[in-house]
Regions:
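N-terminal single-pass transmembrane signal-anchor helix
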Residues: 1-29
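Compositionally biased non-globular segments, especially hydrophobic aliphatic-rich helices
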Residues: 10, 39-42, 114
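Conserved catalytic core of two-component sensor histidine kinases
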Residues: 15, 42, 49
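Regular, well-ordered alpha-helical segments
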Residues: 23, 31-34, 50, 54-57
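Aliphatic-rich helix starts adjacent to a transmembrane/signal segment
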Residues: 28-45
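Periplasmic/extracellular, small/polar-rich flexible segments of pilin-like filament-forming proteins
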Residues: 46-122
Length: 122
């Protein structure tokens, strides 16, 4: 007798393998989305440095409100900017993650940023 097709055991093995692959891939995908959100926040902070320096070149001071001169990426909340004696600090958050990113220019650090002009997230 010539039977064509798959046995129940073969089909169960395929389903188990697909389940294992999905269990590995889904957490990695979620981590990739988190990295993308952090990258967009860092990019916005780097762009903020450029906008602040352009404002400083015109006005010889930093500002807490750049108005239409600066726009954030979709989903990024902020920036919250504070001027200091010799610079400024800023932080942003994202609507889909609990992490925040900060940057500072001058001598007044804002956690988690610990190097001037370099955005850092926590």
């Amino acid at each position: 007798m010539n039977r064509k097709g798959f046995t129940l055991i073969e089909l169960l093995i395929v389903v188990v393998i697909i389940g294992i692959l999905a269990a590995i891939a889904i957490p990695k995908f979620a981590n990739t989305k988190e990295k993308a959100y952090l990258a967009s926040m860092k990019s916005d902070l780097r762009n903020l440095v450029t906008a602040q320096e352009a404002y400083f070149a015109d006005s010889v001071k930093y500002t807490t409100n750049l108005g239409t001169a600066f726009a954030t990426t979709s989903g990024v909340v902020g920036p919250t900017i504070a001027t200091t004696a010799d610079g400024w600090t800023a932080w942003v958050s994202h609507t889909t993650t609990t992490k925040t990113c900060a940057i500072y220019v001058g001598s007044t650090a804002l956690a988690p940023a610990n190097k001037e002009g370099e955005p850092k997230c926590q």
